[in-house]
Structure formats: structure tokens, C-alpha cells
């Protein structure tokens, strides 16, 4: 029982010294997660919908070219940002971009860099979720929607 008293006493002392810092850290984490996740959801929704716009041989060559180009860019974005750890993305964006662009692109605020990193990472994951959801719609449902005048 004496060990538990010592542990609880130590936790109490730590809370007295660092309690406000813990609360501020929790607040910052919740703000970052909320803002960046909402931005990432918007990025993912846009990428997922753009990646599933249908086209065929009868469409204009310019439309087909741009839709293919958009799909390639989105697929590269998704593969790169889903395939690399978020810490690596953060280090590259915060330290690598200023180095490689001779300080032309530099984050002056750590919050902006953090929101950008979490947003683009979340956007890549959400893009695949949206794309998968749209593709999984039964063809009969799509035909029914077109029959009543809905578009993609």
C-alpha cells in the first residue's frame, strides 16, 4: 500500500508543477486535430470526387486529357502522402522546403506548418475513402439516379 501512496504523491506533485502545461497541450492538440481534420476532409472529398468523374471515348479529347491528368496527380498525391510517415512529411515541409527553395517557401508559424501537414495527410486518406465509397455504389443505383435526372 505504501508504494501506491508514493506513486499518487508523485503524480500530485507532477500535476502541481506541470498541470497547466498538460491542459494547454490538450487544448492545442484538440484545436490542431479539429481544424486539420476538417481541412483534410474537404481536400479528401474534392480529390475523391474528381478521381471518379466518368469519361469515355466519345468525350472531348481535352476533357479526357484533363481528367486523366487530374487522376494521375491525385493518385501520386495519395500514394506519396499515404505511403510516408507524417513525421517525415512534417520534417520535410518545415525544414526541407526552405532548404530546397532557398527560403522562398518557409513557414514562419509552426501552427500553419502543423495544420498543413495533418491536413494533406488526412486528405490523402479521405480521398481513398471517398473514391472507394463512390466506386462501391451498385451500378443499378447509378442507373436509377441517372433515370431520375441526377448526374455524377
Per-segment meaning from a language model:
Residues 1-152:
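Transmembrane alpha-helices and adjacent helix-loop boundaries
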Amino acid at each position: 500500500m505504501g508504494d501506491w501512496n508514493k506513486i499518487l504523491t508523485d503524480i500530485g506533485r507532477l500535476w502541481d508543477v506541470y498541470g497547466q502545461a498538460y491542459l494547454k497541450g490538450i487544448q492545442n492538440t484538440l484545436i490542431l486535430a479539429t481544424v486539420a481534420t476538417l481541412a483534410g476532409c474537404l481536400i479528401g472529398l474534392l480529390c475523391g470526387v474528381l478521381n471518379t468523374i466518368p469519361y469515355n471515348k466519345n468525350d472531348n479529347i481535352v476533357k479526357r486529357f484533363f481528367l486523366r491528368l487530374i487522376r494521375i496527380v491525385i493518385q501520386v498525391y495519395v500514394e506519396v502522402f499515404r505511403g510516408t510517415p507524417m513525421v517525415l512529411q512534417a520534417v520535410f515541409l518545415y525544414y526541407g522546403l526552405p532548404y530546397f527553395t532557398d527560403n522562398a517557401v518557409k513557414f514562419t508559424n509552426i501552427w500553419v506548418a502543423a495544420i498543413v501537414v495533418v491536413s494533406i495527410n488526412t486528405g490523402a486518406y479521405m480521398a481513398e475513402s471517398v473514391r472507394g465509397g463512390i466506386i462501391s455504389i451498385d451500378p443499378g443505383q447509378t442507373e436509377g439516379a441517372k433515370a431520375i435526372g441526377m448526374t455524377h
